[in-house]
A protein has these predicted regions:
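Conserved active-site regions of diverse hydrolases
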Residues: 46, 76-85, 101, 139, ...
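Chymotrypsin/trypsin-fold serine protease catalytic domain
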Residues: 108-193, 228, 235-243
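Secretory targeting and sorting signals
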Residues: 1-22
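Short, hydrophobic/aromatic-rich segments at coil-to-beta transitions
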Residues: 31-38, 181-184
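Conserved catalytic-core segment of clan PA serine endopeptidases
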Residues: 23-32, 43, 71, 76-135, ...
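Acidic glycine-/aspartate-rich tracts in secreted/extracellular proteins
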Residues: 42-45, 68-72, 82-85, 116-122, ...
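C-terminal subregion of chymotrypsin/trypsin-like serine protease catalytic domains
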Residues: 23, 29-35, 51-71, 77-78, ...
Length: 249
């Protein structure tokens, strides 16, 4: 989910779901996933933070994220720092979203890339899944979710407050269900899971402990406690978009 921005098309498709943002019930990632980065706002938020969406380096010049994280042709900045502070190194590039984004409720095409002006050096890109490889996953399959989103949701008199700190976080969830475009991942703390929240949108959900990005974070429940809804990268439509920018497995 992008910073508390709810895409109307997603809301219609998923009813009560709201876009995802930050990792909850997780821990600081440190250097475990250096290929996961955050989109940095040109202006600071009122809480002193900067990052509004997450994503993954999938080639030296291509950064994978969600379409609802930007506008076609927009110039954006990306950090790969595990704990971002103003003035840290960023990489500049151009945002390109799937042109079919938002036109189909069953497959919203909520996928995008940032093409960097210069290749990112010293970071090994993540891998993508092969075609159709996620259709028959075991119910016990785990996913590693990574992102810069909200790390805690508090219930205040004025409503829920989402707390951010621009730190790359990681959590593990378990497969809940599979449909043609989505995976639903349990992030219920009572069963030992963690997951995503606002600000984690576009970030990766790695298959188990591998370097394969199975799906990207798109949405979930509004208080970031039960379900992480992620967009599959093994589908024909996702691969059709990605094939314009990277060589697919």
């Amino acid at each position: 989910m992008r910073r508390l921005v709810i895409a109307a098309t997603l809301l219609a498709a998923l009813i009560s779901a709201a876009p995802a943002a930050a990792i909850t019930n997780g821990t600081a990632d440190g250097n475990r996933h250096p290929n996961v980065g955050g989109l940095v706002s040109p202006t600071q938020y009122s809480d002193g933070t900067w990052i509004y969406c997450s994503g993954t380096l999938i080639s030296p010049t291509v950064f994978l994220t969600a379409a609802h994280c930007g506008e076609e042709g927009e110039r954006v900045a990306v950090t790969f720092d595990a704990d971002y502070e103003a003035g840290d190194k960023v990489y500049y590039g151009t945002f390109h979203s799937d042109p079919l984004y938002g036109q189909d409720q069953s497959d919203p095409h909520d996928i995008a890339v940032v093409v960097f002006d210069k290749a990112v050096k010293g970071i090994t890109p993540a891998k993508l899944p092969t075609a159709g490889s996620l259709s028959n996953l075991s119910g016990s399959q785990t996913f590693t979710s990574v992102g810069y989103g909200a790390y805690e949701v508090t219930n205040q008199p004025g409503g829920h407050q989402y707390l951010y700190n621009d730190v790359r976080m990681v959590a593990t969830g378990t497969l809940n269900s599979i449909n043609p475009s989505w995976l639903r991942i349990s992030m219920n703390a009572s069963t030992g899971n963690g997951g995503t929240c606002y600000g984690d949108s576009g970030g990766p959900n790695f298959l188990g402990t591998t370097n394969i990005v199975a799906a990207i974070t798109i949405t979930g429940d509004a208080v970031c406690r039960s379900t992480n809804v992620v967009y599959r990268l093994d589908t024909e439509s996702a691969r059709a978009f990605l094939s314009q920018y990277v060589t697919l497995p």
